[in-house]
Structures are given as C-alpha cells and as structure tokens.
Amino acid sequence: MSRVCEICGKGSLSGNSVSKSKIHTKRVWKPNLVNVKTEIGGRTLTIKMCSRCLKSDYVTKKV
C-alpha cells in the first residue's frame, strides 16, 4: 500500500533540499499517516489517515 491518506488523498511531495551553500538535493516530504481502526458500513476496517483528518473527526475512531 502506498503512503496516501484514504480520506483526503494527501500523499508524498518531492522537491529540493537547499543547503546554506545553495546546493540542491532531491528529497521527499511524507505525510504524517496513522493506522486507525474505524467502523464503516457495519464492518471494522483499518485505514491510513493523516493526522489532520484524525484531528478533524472525519471518521470516528473505534476503541
């Protein structure tokens, strides 16, 4: 499975890391994903969601 939020679709971004001497190096920014057990349609599913969606209560967390 890829590192993508299943709620909002947020994924990895690529770009350049720029040092003080202006040397550009490729790097990847990854989303802060959390595995959450939730109940969807009467079934318990484990989904990957970003911390922003978890904070926003888009999906209720099953305890």
Swiss-Prot record:
This is Large ribosomal subunit protein bL28. Belongs to the bacterial ribosomal protein bL28 family. GO terms for biological process: translation. It comes from the Bacteria. The keyword Endoplasmic reticulum does not apply. One of its GO terms (molecular function) is structural constituent of ribosome. GO terms for cellular component: ribonucleoprotein complex; ribosome. PANTHER family: 50S RIBOSOMAL PROTEIN L28, LARGE RIBOSOMAL SUBUNIT PROTEIN BL28A. Pfam families: Ribosomal_L28. Keywords: Ribonucleoprotein, Ribosomal protein.
